UniProtKB/Swiss-Prot annotation:
Cytoplasmic membrane side: 1361-1405
Keywords: Calcium, Cell junction, Cell membrane, Cell projection, Cytoplasm, Disulfide bond, EGF-like domain, Glycoprotein, Membrane, Repeat, Secreted, Signal, Transmembrane, Transmembrane helix
Segments forming domain Laminin G-like: 482-669, 713-884, 950-1136
Gene: Crb1
UniProt protein name: Protein crumbs homolog 1
Organism: Mus musculus
Matches recorded under InterPro entries: ConA-like_dom_sf (IPR013320), EGF-like_Ca-bd_dom (IPR001881), EGF-like_CS (IPR013032), EGF-like_dom (IPR000742), EGF-type_Asp/Asn_hydroxyl_site (IPR000152), EGF_Ca-bd_CS (IPR018097), Growth_fac_rcpt_cys_sf (IPR009030), Laminin_G (IPR001791)
């Protein structure tokens, strides 16, 4: 269907294209009408079919006879960009001149560059006679109005297309050429595309391969196969060869093409009168009637006719006997013996082996067929036990695939079986058990597990029961036995050999312990020959074995276990000795092994005594605790808890140890966390000692609970001077440390000096608030750490041989290299100063602040010792007081402006009023009072404030007048401001007081400065070198080079770009502006009646601002003495944008952005509106389409007319019946979307071209009815029924199926229901079977544009012939886009064809 429709459309398209092509071909021929030369004035004659007048002379603007001028403006008499206007009825013209020009033809210039005279960015320059436009590259003409056509010189070669650009051009090459001018031919043969030694011929845009004889293809890549024509006969094999072939004949044939058959009967192979019959590469002997048999009739009829062989064996006659060939599974001379294949027991997992030759088992044995056959009697089958499968029952059936386990049980597959692991249901608190977890376990309903033991129920032999899973520290069937023991001081537990069972192949000792002791005995076991000891040394577990008092084994695990947590240790003695620390925080290297130090490891495991926690007390040399019997030295006894002690899996408890064999051991863990009450104060760290605690105090605290604090020494109280001196009472050698806490706010002063009577070892002092350190002969070492901040700092000196390191807390501040010296008894440590004031002043004077907890190594040097046991004698204290109080710094009332003083340690702070600031409230914070309008920024000045803002000038704004307030005393030697504008000539500032004056302006887009001042007779001029009318900000400063001189040259700085512009002459300063001089900002210039149009910052003259805001009502006045006051009363518009708002291109869709400095405005192109030209004006808003749908465009609209209407606005009614196709006398009825045919007589169809389908009477005498619409009568399931034509349904085929019910037409198409089909009437913008093709899609256009005209014409002729043939062969009435012929083979009623033949093709409409 689609093929024929496509062919039909293609036929129409190609026909119209061909006609157009033929028409255009003939239209270009010259006509003989021009042969007479009727045209005058050198004009050209060209024939037009619709007009006999044929003269064309557009170049000379002549009429059709080339005699008179048609348009007086045709020759462009107006010069430049002037506009020529034709005067009606006079044949004359008038020139409308642009600004700056006059005259009849606008040829006279008025020497003015105004009005944007130069186009395309050209720069206008004044000339003595007329303005001159300097054009940018790519443009020419007097006003730069002409785009220079770089393509005029035809720079592109070889048929390339030249595209003109701005100051350049681009060449688009045709295929086969490249390069900027398309002058380089592409050699397509460079890539060697031709294969198999073919010759490559380079051509324009392509290449051609000349192939050898035996190859073909575009690139000669295909070898020619001579065998393709199948030259070899009678099944011969063709062998392809270069340039030829050969035939390998099948047996029985010969010849070049195997065309000759060989006669195998020529040798007369048949004996005894047998008839030879020739075949294809064979023969056979017909022995009929000869009394012989065999291939050549050579054998008498055989003895096997008596069938001597058993079990369906095959009999073979010999010369005087026969041979039986047995079937598989049988043996013997007559095949009478059945081979027993089950003798090797091939079936696994108790499978039963059954031989296939057991004929009696067939029909009643699973796994065997119902009947016996000798063909399958060889072998065996395995009948598997339940749970197994496979040929040999080798595969275990996964019973878990059937999910036998209930209630969430987990199934485990077993050989031939399965096991269910039943869960505990946390929701219902129910245990399940039984084979399939179907039983609710009741054993724990009234369980007796003690001490939080977990009850585990079970169901065995139909009985419910339970077991108890005990927590650590408990054992027994009901967890009733306590296995936790608490060991006090000197406690022990003696386990005799009778307390536990005998030995096995290995022995195992395990226990859990809980202690804070770093050193303790856990276990000792053995005798005088061999002993094993398990102990804690420095918190780590150690295991040692001694043999005859010699240490043989020492194992240890480097992990701290003296942390008050539970730890599990296990010792195993077998072939190797293993020590393991299990669980807890030990993550790696928690197991260590060694060989057993004795030949028989069971000698260590022998039944012998063991001691847990300690040994019975005895005394030996040096008061060491020993085992009295064997005199074994021991570590301190264990204080803590042992739990779950097992000797060879036997629990050791107090109950199974004899009375009197333990001391200070109790059941349970009675340890107390002494640190729980946090007894250590002032950040002290508490250490739990099981029977007490110990506090490690942070400096400067001490005492058992860190409650005491070393008394600080106060130096320089109320600005006094003093020091402290300590005499060293021991020899400390070359390695020692000296540390102290220091608090100060003073940036200078001696902190520490260490010396003897003749030599000063080291001195430490404050310099600019940081520490400095020096030794004799070495440079000063300054530390990058600020100490004088009033905080407490721990300072430490660590003296080593040849080096001193300085620390602040744990931070290393650096080191210095020093000679080695030794601290001896009698040396003196000075703190805070020296007895000699002059020596002290060398280090910035005496120290002011506090020093606390001075330590030499671990010895404390106390200023005020409270014990007579101090290792040092009383120090020398001069003006050193106890504690660390601060001076009363508020005594002198340091706060100004009503500030309130608050005393700090050796410092003060002021609570200042809201309008003041500074350490002493000496600064008034004017800007915090919000003195400026919202559009201005407040800037604090030394004596007041100023409101800073950027002013916006519109070109029509009034000038702003300023005057001095008469109090300016400073020298005015400079002026600074910033601006941005597009003006070329404009005045910025003007001030004048005869004979002195100041002008700052822009001339020819450059900054211009004029000044006459002081006693100078010269007017100073400065002209900038850069253009400043680009709309961006420019920062400008004019200043005297020598500001202290009476006259000086001036310089101009623009945007800090060097070199600066410097004047050639000198003049005075701007001091004349102090004397009531009027200063005008934004004034008009002489040659520009408009004022400044742009932005101007607040101008600064000599550091004094020209504020745009007078003292407004509601805002405080400015307190500074020196001011320039705004005299004019006009309001100044502020709020200039920091940059050109048009730089971001805010205007869309070609809109032109106009910078207004405080904002921007978009001038939109036709069809667009909105702030940014973002709104496409809806031309459809007025509903211009009368009978159609309106599609909005840009500044336009398009009407898509409803069927039956046409015209720009769909206003014209189309007569749809004008070209109707109604046949057979039918009447055309016009409709909105087309027309319909009212059929006459016995005709039907859309165009009434077909006869109505006949009716058939169906049934018998009892039951009869009529089948309409061509339906036929048929017997179906013993009843008469109507079999309907495609497109009809119902019991009597009376209902026409509505093919439009599925709404097949898309994109607004209208569906028309027809017989067995539908027709989509598409909107004008769509086409296709279902209106699915969008005609506006560019992909549907220009498919054939790339084909050459000559080739295309030939292709059209051939294609049209084929299409016409195809249409003729398929010509039939298939209206619309739905073909019933497709339904005939693939429609929903194809299943009826088995009962009724398909209709004739002519009647399927």
């Amino acid at each position: 269907m689609k093929l024929k429709r496509t062919a039909y459309l293609l036929f129409l398209y190609l026909s119209s294209s061909l006609l157009i092509c033929i028409k255009n071909s003939f239209c270009n021929k010259n006509n003989t009408r021009c042969l007479s030369g009727p045209c005058q004035n050198n004009s050209t004659c060209k024939h037009f079919p619709q007009d006999n007048n044929c003269c064309l002379d557009t170049a000379n603007n002549l009429d059709k006879d080339c005699e008179d001028l048609k348009d007086p403006c045709f020759s462009s008499p107006c010069q430049g960009i002037a506009t020529c206007v034709k005067i009606p009825g006079e044949g004359n013209f008038l020139c409308q001149c642009p600004p700056g020009y006059s005259g009849l033809n606008c040829e006279t210039a008025t020497n003015s560059c105004g009005g944007n005279l130069c186009q395309h960015g050209g720069t206008c320059r004044k000339d003595p006679e007329h303005p001159v436009c300097i054009c940018p590259p790519g443009y020419a003409g007097r006003f730069c109005e002409t785009d220079h056509n770089e393509c005029a010189s035809s720079p592109c070669h070889n048929g390339a297309m030249c595209q003109d650009g701005i100051n350049g051009y681009s060449c688009f090459c045709v295929p086969g050429y490249q390069g900027r001018h398309c002058d380089l031919e592409v050699d397509e043969c460079v890539s060697d595309p031709c294969k198999n030694e073919a010759v490559c011929l380079n051509e324009i845009g392509r290449y051609t391969c000349v192939c050898p004889q035996e190859f073909s293809g575009v690139n000669c890549e295909l070898e020619i196969d001579e065998c393709r024509s199948q030259p070899c006969l009678h099944g011969a094999t063709c062998q392809d060869a270069p340039g030829g072939y050969s035939c390998d004949c099948a047996p029985g044939f010969l010849g070049e093409h195997c065309e000759l058959s060989v006669n195998e009967c020529e040798s007369q192979p048949c004996l005894h009168g047998g008839l030879c019959v020739d075949g294809r590469n064979s023969y056979h002997c017909d022995c009929t009637g000869s009394g012989f048999t065999g291939m050549h009739c050579e054998s008498l009829i055989p003895l096997c006719w008596s069938k001597p062989c058993h079990n369906d064996a095959t009999c073979e006659d010999t010369v005087d006997s026969y041979i039986c060939h047995c079937r598989p599974g049988y043996t013997g001379a007559l095949c009478e013996t059945d081979i027993n294949e089950c003798s090797s027991n091939p079936c696994q997992f108790w499978g039963e082996c059954v031989e296939l030759s057991s004929e009696g088992l067939y029909g009643n044995t699973a796994g065997l067929p119902s009947s016996f056959s000798y063909v399958g009697a060889s072998g065996y089958v395995c009948i598997c036990q339940p749970g197994f499968t496979g040929i040999h029952c080798e595969e275990d059936v996964d019973e878990c695939l059937l999910h036998p386990c209930l209630n969430g049980g987990t199934c485990e597959n077993l050989p031939g079986n399965y096991a269910c692991h039943c869960p505990f249901d946390d929701t219902s608190r129910t245990f399940y058990g039984g084979e399939n977890c179907s039983e609710i376990l009741l054993g724990c309903t009234h369980h007796q597990c003690l001490n939080n033991g977990k009850c585990i129920p079970h169901f065995q032999n139909g009985q419910h029961g339970f077991t108890c899973q005990c927590l650590s520290g408990y054992a027994g069937p009901l967890c009733e036995t306590v296995t936790t023991l608490s060991f006090g001081s000197n406690g022990f537990l003696w386990v005799t050999s009778g307390s536990h069972t005998g030995i096995g192949p290995e022995c195992n000792i395990s226990l859990r312990f809980h202690t804070v002791q770093p050193n303790a005995l856990l276990l000792i076991r053995g005798n005088k020959d061999v002993s094993m000891k398990l102990e804690l040394l420095n918190g780590c577990v150690h295991l040692s074995i001694e043999v005859w008092n010699q240490l043989k084994v020492l194992l240890s695990i480097s992990h701290n276990t003296s942390d008050g947590e539970w730890h599990f240790v296990e010792v195993t003695i077998a072939e190797t000795l293993t020590l393991a620390l299990v669980g807890g925080s030990c993550k790696e290297k928690c197991t260590t092994k060694s060989s057993v130090p004795v030949e028989n490891h069971q000698s260590i495991c022998a039944l012998q005594d063991s001691f847990l926690g300690g040994l019975p007390m005895g005394t030996a040399n040096n008061s060491v605790s020993v085992l009295n019997i064997y005199n074994v030295p021991s570590t301190p006894s264990f204080v803590g808890c042992l739990q779950d002690i097992r000797f060879d899996l036997n629990h050791i408890t107090l109950e199974n140890v004899s009375s009197g064999l333990s001391s200070n051991v109790k059941a349970g863990c009675l340890g107390k966390d002494w640190c729980e009450s946090q007894p250590c104060q002032n950040r002290g760290r508490c250490i739990n000692l099981w029977q007490g605690y110990q506090c490690e105090c942070d400096r400067p605290y001490t005492g058992s609970n860190c409650l005491k604090e070393y008394v600080a020494g106060r130096f320089g109280q109320d600005d006094s001077t003093g020091y402290a001196a300590f005499s060293v009472n021991d020899n400390y050698g070359q390695n020692f440390s000296l540390s102290m806490f220091v608090r100060t706010r003073q940036p200078l002063g001696l902190l520490l000096a260490l010396e003897n009577s003749t030599y000063q070892y080291v001195s430490v002092w404050l310099e600019h608030g940081s520490l400095a350190l020096q030794t004799p002969g070495s440079p000063k070492f300054m530390v990058n750490f600020f100490l004088s901040d009033g905080n407490v700092h721990l300072i430490s000196l660590r003296i080593k041989p040849n080096e001193i390191e300085l620390y602040q807390s744990s931070q290393n501040l650096g080191f210095i290299s020093v000679p080695t010296w030794t601290i001896r008894r009698g040396d003196v440590i000075f703190i805070g100063g020296l007895p000699d004031r002059e020596k002290t002043e060398v280090y910035g004077g005496f120290f002011k602040g506090c020093v606390q907890d001075v330590r030499l190594n671990s010895q404390t040097l106390e200023f005020f010792p409270n014990s007579t046991n101090n290792a040092y004698d009383d120090p020398i204290l001069v003006n050193v007081t106890q504690g660390c109080p601060g001076d009363n710094t508020c005594k002198s009332n340091p706060c100004h402006n009503g500030g309130v003083c608050h005393s700090l340690w050796d410092d003060f702070s002021c609570s200042c009023p809201t309008n003041t600031a500074g350490r002493a409230c000496e600064q008034v914070q004017w800007c915090q009072l919000s003195p400026c309008p919202p559009t201005a920024e407040c800037q604090l000045l030394p004596q007041g404030f100023e409101c800073i803002a950027n002013a916006v000038f519109s070109g029509l704004s009034r000038e702003i007048l300023f005057r001095s307030n008469g109090n300016i005393t400073r020298e005015l030697t400079n002026i600074t401001f910033a601006f941005r504008t597009h003006d070329t000539n404009v005045m910025i500032l003007h001030a004048e007081k005869e004979p002195e004056f100041l002008n700052i302006s822009i001339q020819d887009a450059r900054l211009f400065f004029q000044l006459r001042s002081g006693n100078s007779f010269y007017t100073l001029h400065l002209m900038g070198s850069q253009l400043v009318n680009d709309g961006t900000w420019h920062q400008v400063t004019f200043s005297m080079i020598d500001p202290v001189a009476q006259t000086s040259r001036w310089q101009m700085e623009v945007n800090d770009q060097t070199p600066f512009v410097i004047s050639e002459v000198a003049t005075g300063s701007l001091n004349f502006l102090k004397d009531n001089t009027d200063i005008y900002v934004g004034d008009q210039s002489v040659d520009n009646p408009k004022g400044l149009q742009g932005c101007l910052s607040t101008i600064e003259i000599g550091g004094i601002y020209l504020s745009y805001f007078e003292n407004l009502h509601g805002f405080p006045g400015k307190p500074q003495e020196e001011q320039f006051l705004k005299v004019s009363t006009n309001m100044v518009l502020t709020g200039c944008l920091p940059s050109n708002a048009c730089h971001s291109s805010p205007c869309l869709h070609g809109g032109n952005c106009e910078d207004s400095y405080s904002s921007y405005r978009c001038a939109c192109l036709s069809g667009w509106s909105g702030t940014h030209c973002e709104i496409n004006i809806d031309e459809c808003f007025s509903s211009p389409c009368i009978h159609g749908n309106c599609s909005d465009g840009v500044a336009a609209y398009h009407c898509r007319c409803e069927p039956g209407y046409t015209g720009v606005n769909c206003e014209v009614d189309v007569d749809n019946c004008k070209s109707h196709q109604c046949a057979n006398g039918a009447t055309c009825v016009p409709e909105a979307h087309g027309y319909s045919c009212l059929c006459f007589g016995n005709f039907t169809g859309r165009f009434c071209r077909h006869s109505r389908l006949p009716s058939t009477v169906c049934g018998n005498e009892k039951r009869n009815f009529t089948c309409y619409n061509g339906g036929s009568c048929s017997m179906f399931q013993e009843d008469w029924q109507c079999m309907c034509w495609p497109g009809f349904t119902g019991e009597w085929c009376e209902e026409d199926i509505n093919e439009c019910a599925s709404d097949p037409c898309i994109n607004g198409g209208l569906c028309r229901d027809l017989v067995n089909r539908f027709l989509c009437i598409c909107d004008v913008a769509f086409a296709g079977e279902r209106c699915e093709l969008d005609l506006a899609d560019d992909r549907l256009l220009g498919i054939f544009t790339a084909v050459g005209s000559g080739t295309l014409a030939l292709f059209f002729i051939l294609l049209l012939a084929g299409v016409a043939s195809l249409i003729a062969s398929n010509k039939r009435a298939t209206q619309g886009t739905y073909s019933p012929s497709g339904q005939e083979k693939a429609g929903p009623r194809v299943e009826m064809w088995i009962r009724m033949p398909p209709p004739a093709l002519e009647r399927l409409i």
